[in-house]
Swiss-Prot record:
It is found in: Golgi apparatus membrane. It is an enzyme of class 2 (transferase). This is Carbohydrate sulfotransferase 3. Glycans are attached at N63, N74, N96, N252, N415, N459. The keyword Transferase applies. PANTHER family: CARBOHYDRATE SULFOTRANSFERASE, CARBOHYDRATE SULFOTRANSFERASE 3. Keywords: Carbohydrate metabolism, Glycoprotein, Golgi apparatus, Membrane, Signal-anchor, Transferase, Transmembrane, Transmembrane helix. Residues 39-474 are lumenal. Belongs to the sulfotransferase 1 family. Gal/GlcNAc/GalNAc subfamily. The keyword Membrane applies. The lineage of its organism: Eukaryota, Metazoa, Chordata, Craniata, Vertebrata. The chain crosses the membrane at residues 20-38.
Amino acid sequence: MEKGLALPQDCRDLVHNLKIRGRYVLFLAFVVIVFIFIEKENKIISRVSDKLKQIPQFVADANSTDPALLLSENASLLSLSELDSTFSHLRSRLHNLSLQLGIAPAMEAQGQEAVAEKPSQQAGAGTRRHVLLMATTRTGSSFVGEFFNQQGNIFYLFEPLWHIERTVFFQQGGASAAGSALVYRDVLKQLLLCDLYVLEPFISPPPEDHLTQFLFRRGSSRSLCEDPVCTPFVKKVFEKYHCRNRHCGPLNVTLAAEACRRKDHMALKVVRIRQLEFLQPLAEDPRLDLRVIQLVRDPRAVLASRMVAFAGKYESWKKWLSEGQDQLSENEVQRLRGNCENIRLSAELGLRQPAWLRGRYMLVRYEDVARRPLQKAREMYRSAGIPLTPQVEDWIQKNTQAARDSSDVYSTQKNSSEQFEKWRFSIPFKLAQVVQAVCGPAMHLFGHKLAKDTASLTNRSISLLEERGTFWVT
């Protein structure tokens, strides 16, 4: 029997063509699988997006501890891994795959303009700074934020995360608190990159053609009230958060994003980032040169100020004081403890100087800013790596020596050398005792001394503040 037969030339050509076609079939199958993978991940993103865009009429507590993401009544809570991968890993991979396969990015597909980065934002440029003033409510953050708002080459935004807190349903506690932090972080990253469109799904009512009259505290950002962002005023158009010193038309988000990219630096003031560790991906992002300034204040002063500014949310405290009850609600105590612990743990992390935060973190006490505003402003600018201009120095001189403090609880004009101790005469010692018992570890770290009795609390000659030097700068 013969060992083999020679195939005719036609047969050999047929076999060869089948092999080539087989390779194409495999390649096409691979492409189909990739598209299926993309579609699947898009559904995951859509699922999370749909959950987040539920807009119940709910006013979140601005002072709540560790707000947690709450989905609709019958929806299952997404795991932290789903949230994190959805808002970070999957979106980046989908964007890269889309570019490689020639698919338009989602933003462009929806008719939005892609946000081009300023050349100085590219890795290695080393000149553009992204400053994050991290604080909690009633710590003087609006006042300190003006140090950056008043500098002409800095694009400054005031509390942009307010819209997310008002739009997404939050509750306190639970493992899903980390999920809400991931949402904040994802939005924050896009804002630092001048992608202001990221706010549009959270603004209510929604912007039309990138125009809105409802951006929170627009007037607190000089950059949003300057030309060309300040468009001609439109009569009979109500703008809830209008510019302070001039009439402008509705905010054009596209013009604002372009102005952001033209500025040399970017600064944000936020009171809704609770844990410093969640900012690590931002500090490690090569497109950003993040500088974090954590502002802290005596928790006794913070509580006294909140009871005035947010009176309706502290009725239980007032009732406890007026009725002379022995114990305060455990929920209120735990909320206060949670606030103090978040601040303390974040500061301890910053002061440990992990590699990702080294050279990017500064801890500042409001009391030091109030006593020596110009000196502290210079230190903050030096920490941020930005030269301080005479424009800011002049503003500080004029606005920290006001003849009298404004009656507006949100005013940035203060007789700062006197302001920081006024709380000592407005808070009962009974209330101070509770704060000292609950927030003792944080007070010890920040150098806020305990008051032994009513006399020591109200005696200005007895300092309740330890002197600290460059310990606060890392």
